[in-house]
Structures are given as C-alpha cells and as structure tokens.
C-alpha cells in the first residue's frame, strides 16, 4: 500500500493567487531526509514531495502502468478537471475511457515535475532551513533530476517496470531520458515533438522569457513572495513570446488574420486593435494566475541544459545501445520549435543503437501545440503504437 497525503499548504503568493496547495485534489508522495534526491548540481534535495494523479487501476502483475510526462507549463492534471482553472485536463484527447490511454485498461500516472508549482517541491515551496519560500535559493534542476524523482515515485508505488512512458515537448525529453537512465524499467516509449537536446534557437527564446521576468521590478530577485508583489508583467510577456513559438504562421492566419478586435477601424493607439494582440494578452494574463514565475525560470533552464549525448562522449547512438525499449517518435510538419529534422536525428540514433523504433511525421498546420490538440491522425498513431506494444509485451486483452 502506498502511503500518500493530501497536499498541505505551501507558500502562496502575497495576492493569494490560487495554487494546487489550496486545492488538495492530488496525491502526494513525501520523501524525508533519509531519502534525498541527488541533483546534477551536486545538491541533495531533502525533504521533498511529488504531487501526482492516477487514473485506472494497477493490474495483478503490475504490467499495465503508463507514466505521462507533462510539458513546461503542464502539471499532473492530465485528464481531470483542473482544481485551479476549472478547465478539463490538458490531454483529454488521449486520456480517458475509449481513448488511446484508456484507464479501463491502463494504470496511468502523471506527476508534477520537481521545480514546478502545482504541489511538487519547487522554488515557491518552503525551505525547511529558513521557514520561508526557497526563491532562488532553490537548487538548479535538470531533466535527469526530474526523471530520478519520478523513478522514486514509481518505486514508492511498487512498480518495477513501466509498460510505457509518454510525453510531448519537455515531456518528450523526460520520456527519452527515462529510456536512457532506466532502460530495463521502460518497455515502450512514445516521444512526441521533442529532441535529445535543446537547440540554440530554443535556448534563445527561453532566455528572452527569463529576462522579461527578471526585468520586472516586482520580481525582487526572486523574493517576491516575501515582498507582497508578483512579476505579472514580466511573466505575462514571457508567456506571450513563448506562446507564439507553439503556433504556426498558417494557424495564426487562419484563426486571426489581420481582423480587428471589436472594432472596424484602428484606434491609432497602442491598444489591442488586432484580435491576435488581444489573444496574446489573454494568454499572458491567464497564465500568471496559475503559474509561478520562479518555476518558469527553473524549468526553462532545465530544458536548456538537456543533452543526452553529452554523457556519452557526444555520440547519441551510444545512449541507446542495445536497448530493449520499443520506441515511437512523432513530429509535426509545422512545428518550428522542435522541427521534424530533430525527430529524425533521434530516430537515426535509435536505429544506430539497435533500437526498435517507428517514426511518424504528421501533416498539420497547428504548430508545436498540435500534440495537445485533437489531431485524428496523431490519436490513431498513439492508439496503434500502444496496441502493438501491448501485444509485444503480453498486455493485450488483460484486464485490471
């Protein structure tokens, strides 16, 4: 039996913005001082906690567990109503009864990554040594750190081997890291719209966002929790800039074009005359109500540092040498954040390492965010891969 606890109150922003800590809807695994998380930066993080959601039930031989890894600003609420926003889970296109990740067949786990702000320990959590929010005293974390923490959670749940690890964007990075760090614990891996290392362009976009946050006078060098302020403007601008990279020119043209917002003529001012301006402002303002600015700094930095080949003398294929994991790599034609060329590099490395891998490039103009949207071909590919992996690993037809 897994010992879990409801999320207890952690540090909240001075303006009493809603946090997962205020809505104890997740389970939490607590790890004490005797179970530290060794971070790549050399720090042992302890105590710490991981907030997570589960859907479905673990079968008798514990062979039907799927770990879903969320993206940069995602969280553990993959298929339930979000306790803060009241919106449906972020991957309802894939997770749910009759869908590819069916809780009537699989035991689905999704945890909030270390460093985030939806219940897992991060910079907005209380530093046990000071009794105050960590802020920038929180240690730098990496994608491998996130995966090590997830592995500790999977151990706590009593699961030796995962049937599948699946994720898109930063979640895809975690998926690939799982397959490298714990190859015997991952039967299959579905890596979507991602790469094995962040490009210079993506690092540049992240630096733009971080500088926007840090330039906000309300940031207070990360100590805004204690100052009774919050860097709304900086984080909002960071989100607006990032959101553009998740879309495509065709999608923006189709959705907005040059149409005016509630007017026929320009105001000859700096108001949001165009619909696309109003849309971006909404994206920025709604984001700051659910996400912590320091967490944004930490998680973007974790993505920037990610480079699987770096630990294998720069030879990516060596990271996957003789792996027994079955892979499916998916890209989207209009994704310019993680273009198909990067997915092909992953596939080539997997092939060179002797891995079993299938690859799909999906034609769509919906940009990077296509993996979060209802794209029928994508849904069909995920379903087919899980079915074939289930047959290969003796899971087909098994109940709970």
Swiss-Prot record:
UniProt feature, compositional bias: Polar residues: 1-11
GO biological process: homoserine metabolic process; methionine biosynthetic process
UniProt keyword Oxidoreductase, yes or no: no
Pfam families in the record: Abhydrolase_1
Signal peptide: none
Associated pathway: Amino-acid biosynthesis; L-methionine biosynthesis via de novo pathway; O-acetyl-L-homoserine from L-homoserine: step 1/1
Biased composition (Basic and acidic residues): 13-23
Domain AB hydrolase-1, chain residue ranges per copy: 64-373
Region (Disordered) location: 1-24
Domain of life: Bacteria
Residues binding substrate: 239, 369
Function, in words: Transfers an acetyl group from acetyl-CoA to L-homoserine, forming acetyl-L-homoserine.
Similarity field: Belongs to the AB hydrolase superfamily. MetX family.
Protein name as annotated: Homoserine O-acetyltransferase
Source organism per UniProt: Rhodopseudomonas palustris (strain BisB18)
């Amino acid at each position: 039996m897994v010992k879990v606890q409801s999320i207890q109150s952690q540090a909240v922003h001075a303006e009493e913005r809603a946090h997962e800590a205020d809505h104890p809807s997740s389970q939490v695994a607590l790890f004490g001082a005797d179970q530290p998380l060794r971070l790549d930066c050399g720090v042992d993080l302890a105590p710490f906690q991981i907030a997570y959601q589960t859907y479905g039930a673990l079968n008798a031989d514990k062979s039907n567990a799927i770990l879903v890894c969320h993206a940069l600003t995602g969280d553990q609420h993959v298929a339930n109503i979000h306790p803060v926003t009241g919106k449906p889970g972020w991957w309802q296109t894939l997770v749910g009864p009759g869908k590819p990740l069916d809780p009537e067949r699989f035991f689905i786990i999704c945890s909030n990554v270390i460093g985030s702000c939806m219940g897992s320990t991060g910079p907005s959590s209380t530093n046990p040594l000071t009794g105050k929010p960590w802020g920038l005293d929180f240690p730098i974390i990496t994608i491998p750190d996130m995966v090590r923490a997830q592995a500790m959670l999977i151990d706590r749940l009593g699961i030796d081997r995962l049937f599948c690890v699946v994720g898109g964007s930063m979640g895809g990075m975690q998926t690939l890291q799982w397959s490298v760090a714990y190859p015997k614990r991952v039967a299959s891996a579905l890596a979507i719209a991602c790469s094995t290392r962040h490009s210079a362009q993506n690092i540049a976009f992240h630096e733009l966002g971080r500088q926007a946050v840090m330039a906000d006078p309300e940031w207070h060098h990360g100590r805004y929790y204690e100052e009774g302020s919050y860097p709304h403007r900086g984080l909002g601008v960071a989100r607006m800039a990032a959101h553009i990279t998740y879309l495509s020119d065709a999608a923006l043209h189709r959705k907005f074009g040059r149409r005016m917002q509630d007017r026929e003529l320009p105001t000859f001012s700096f108001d949001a005359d165009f619909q696309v301006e109003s849309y971006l402002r909404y994206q920025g303002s709604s984001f700051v109500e659910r996400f912590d600015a320091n967490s944004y700094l930490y998680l973007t930095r974790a993505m920037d540092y990610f480079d699987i080949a770096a630990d294998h003398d720069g030879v990516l294929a060596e990271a996957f040498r003789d792996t027994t994991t079955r892979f499916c790599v998916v890209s989207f034609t209009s994704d310019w954040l993680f273009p198909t060329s990067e997915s092909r590099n992953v596939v080539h490395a997997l092939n060179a390492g002797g891995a079993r891998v299938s690859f799909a490039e999906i034609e769509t103009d919906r940009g990077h965010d296509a993996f979060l949207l209802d794209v029928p071909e994508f849904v069909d590919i995920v379903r087919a891969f899980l079915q074939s992996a289930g047959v290969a690993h003796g899971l087909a037809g098994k109940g709970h």
